[in-house]
């Protein structure tokens, strides 16, 4: 016998579809916060465990990035599963803890192989950008508890960085033959943790849910007009 489960009731994740003879499954250590709509017809991005540099790892369904004692100038890197090809795309990342600097932004392919191509917003207010305008300093700083927004326009090749729903700066990335991805890193040998939110599941609590213009995704802050959750 099989089981038909729609997962359409967040208060009863173990519910078996009505009309079948089987009872519901019990759930353990699961709440409504541990689930999100993500189906073959609309798949949201997550972190890509196959495209990271050790000792960084993804947890929480590949949405929480944890790096401990990264080595070298730029620590351990990560990228999302869906490339930013065409259109306008948005994600959030909540800074959880760090003993060094956070860096969140966009990069083509694997960041360690493209140091001269990425565009990142660091927690000390510095922007590291290989594109037009280059590196800049003196922007708004951020720390644990802050939510950084990244909104990428593939046609214009620009990225809007925001902090807690307020735009900080718009940067033009360098033209690149490979598509960009959302991603991030810490700095040097620091320890840092961040929770990504591409619109699907995220491990941090969202107090005032916002969606994109198509009604997709769940974000703490509304995406800029015309930008969408990173999903299929």
Protein language model annotation of sequence segments:
Residues 1-232:
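PRY/SPRY (B30.2) beta-sandwich protein-interaction domains
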